[in-house]
């Protein structure tokens, strides 16, 4: 019976992790039988198909790398997906799929899964996929981003600012666009997201965003 539940969860993740451009994506709900299972079981059954066995991410499936984020940030985002803080906007198809794919996670599940991701899986460094002027990007980053995300882009949990170094560059771009477009940071309980949404327009155009991301890609991640 457990094997059947695992296979169903794997199938669900394969369907749910598509990109935002899918016309009418099927949206499965996480199998309730996985709630309360060991972190590795949840990870391998529900997450690996999209995020990769090492948490390295998969651009084709819209799944970012995860292992350079802090356990605190991962826990908060998973909690937001479960509670409806994230994935609630009608135009956020990817967020909606993610929210439903983890719908049955409990607070304990989230805590052990976040710990597993950040301690048991190897730190990965995604492949660079975007082009930009890292020198220009450094100026923008130092003036606009470093106060919260740190001069080394390794984040600051006290400020709710995630690590950026070591995160998939295409996902950084997608997330930034989400804040600009109002897909993220609009829920009344998303305090940190609201801060980011207010600050996002500070970068004038997409070239500037790419330059900042190009600079971030030159920085060493939190975990080697």
What spans do the regions from the language model cover?
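Sec-dependent signal peptide recognition
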Residues: 2-8
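Short loop/beta submotifs within extracellular cysteine-rich repeat domains
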Residues: 6, 49, 55-58, 73-75, ...
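The feature marks the first
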Residues: 27, 33-40, 44-83
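Sequence/structural segment immediately N-terminal to covalent heme-attachment motifs in c-type
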Residues: 31-54, 129-154
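Axial heme c-ligation environment in periplasmic c-type cytochrome domains
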Residues: 58-65, 81-110, 127, 131, ...
